[in-house]
């Protein structure tokens, strides 16, 4: 019997277009200014150091070329690390340091009123109904936990964070590795077979299924992946109830 619903965000509860066309460009545009403004902040400096360590260990040829260029040129630390972070954004690398910095930039954007998050039309209705039926709701996204909470706090329909009991990001583990899902079930203190995971990524569904979770593939218009392979697809979150009986 399913008791917990673990939800991806982008392409599952929120259109991919909001993330790709609004959130990512906003963080990309404001990255260098944010780092310059907060360079004295210990947490921000720690994230910059983490990104530097990641860069030096990065085996990707283009990342290595970028690092060699940084050592040759007389650029500032901020300019150099920004070039690497912009590179990670371009190649869609799931870097925890980058995700944390993006979350901090988005927080400022939300608080200034520059950003309001748009969810799928049925998302809030479905989440409320699940909550009313005593399902425990949790989030697992590649975006940082702070970014996840910001997205749900600043929706066009108000604050929805109270709907969720657990939040997980890539610091828990890679979303494409089955161990991450086992660890999540342990963190929620629930047998893995009692969890339903919903995502628009086949690789993530594969990993969750391997761990023992039930899975549904979010097949929405505009999502990058349109082939569910052997996973059960749903085109609307309301369809989720058909698989909880």
Swiss-Prot record:
Q: Which GO terms describe its biological process?
A: L-methionine salvage from methylthioadenosine
Q: What's the domain of life for this entry?
A: Bacteria
- Output the CDD domains linked to this UniProt entry: HAD_EP (cd01629)
EC code: 3.1.3.77
Q: Which reaction does it catalyse?
A: 5-methylsulfanyl-2,3-dioxopentyl phosphate + H2O = 1,2-dihydroxy-5-(methylsulfanyl)pent-1-en-3-one + phosphate
Q: Which cofactor does it need?
A: Mg(2+)
- GO MF annotations, alphabetized: 2,3-diketo-5-methylthiopentyl-1-phosphate enolase activity; 2-hydroxy-3-keto-5-methylthiopentenyl-1-phosphate phosphatase activity; acireductone synthase activity; magnesium ion binding
The annotation note on the cofactor reads: Binds 1 Mg(2+) ion per subunit.
- Metabolic or biological pathway, per its Swiss-Prot or TrEMBL entry: Amino-acid biosynthesis; L-methionine biosynthesis via salvage pathway; L-methionine from S-methyl-5-thio-alpha-D-ribose 1-phosphate: step 3/6; Amino-acid biosynthesis; L-methionine biosynthesis via salvage pathway; L-methionine from S-methyl-5-thio-alpha-D-ribose 1-phosphate: step 4/6
The alphabetized UniProt keywords are: Amino-acid biosynthesis, Hydrolase, Magnesium, Metal-binding, Methionine biosynthesis
Q: Which Pfam families match?
A: Hydrolase
Query: What is this protein's function?
Result: Bifunctional enzyme that catalyzes the enolization of 2,3-diketo-5-methylthiopentyl-1-phosphate (DK-MTP-1-P) into the intermediate 2-hydroxy-3-keto-5-methylthiopentenyl-1-phosphate (HK-MTPenyl-1-P), which is then dephosphorylated to form the acireductone 1,2-dihydroxy-3-keto-5-methylthiopentene (DHK-MTPene).
Describe the protein's quaternary organization and the partners it interacts with.
Answer: Monomer.
Q: Which family does it belong to?
A: Belongs to the HAD-like hydrolase superfamily. MasA/MtnC family.
What name does this protein carry? Enolase-phosphatase E1
Species of origin = Prochlorococcus marinus (strain MIT 9313)
Q: What is the lineage of its organism?
A: Bacteria, Bacillati, Cyanobacteriota, Cyanophyceae, Synechococcales
The primary gene name is mtnC
């Amino acid at each position: 019997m399913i008791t917990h619903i673990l939800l991806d965000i982008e392409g599952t509860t929120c259109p991919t277009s909001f993330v790709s066309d609004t959130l990512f460009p906003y963080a990309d545009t404001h990255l260098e200014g944010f780092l310059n403004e907060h360079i004295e902040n210990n947490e921000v400096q720690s994230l910059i150091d983490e990104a530097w360590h990641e860069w030096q260990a990065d085996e990707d040829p283009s990342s290595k070329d970028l690092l060699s260029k940084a050592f040759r040129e007389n650029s500032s630390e901020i300019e150099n690390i920004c070039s690497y972070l912009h590179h990670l954004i371009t190649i869609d690398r799931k870097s925890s340091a980058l995700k944390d910095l993006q979350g901090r930039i988005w927080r400022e954007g939300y608080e200034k009123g520059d950003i309001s998050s748009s969810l799928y039309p049925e998302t809030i209705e479905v989440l409320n109904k699940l909550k009313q039926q005593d399902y425990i709701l949790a989030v697992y996204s590649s975006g940082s936990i702070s970014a996840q909470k910001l997205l749900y706090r600043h929706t066009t329909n108000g604050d929805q964070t109270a709907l969720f009991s657990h939040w997980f990001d890539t610091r828990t583990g890679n979303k494409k590795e089955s161990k991450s899902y086992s660890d999540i079930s342990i963190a929620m203190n629930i047998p893995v077979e009692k969890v339903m995971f919903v995502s628009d990524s086949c690789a993530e569904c594969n990993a969750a299924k391997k761990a023992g979770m039930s899975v549904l593939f979010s097949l929405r218009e505009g999502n990058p992946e349109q082939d569910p392979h052997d996973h059960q697809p749903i085109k609307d979150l309301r369809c989720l109830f058909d698989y909880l009986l």
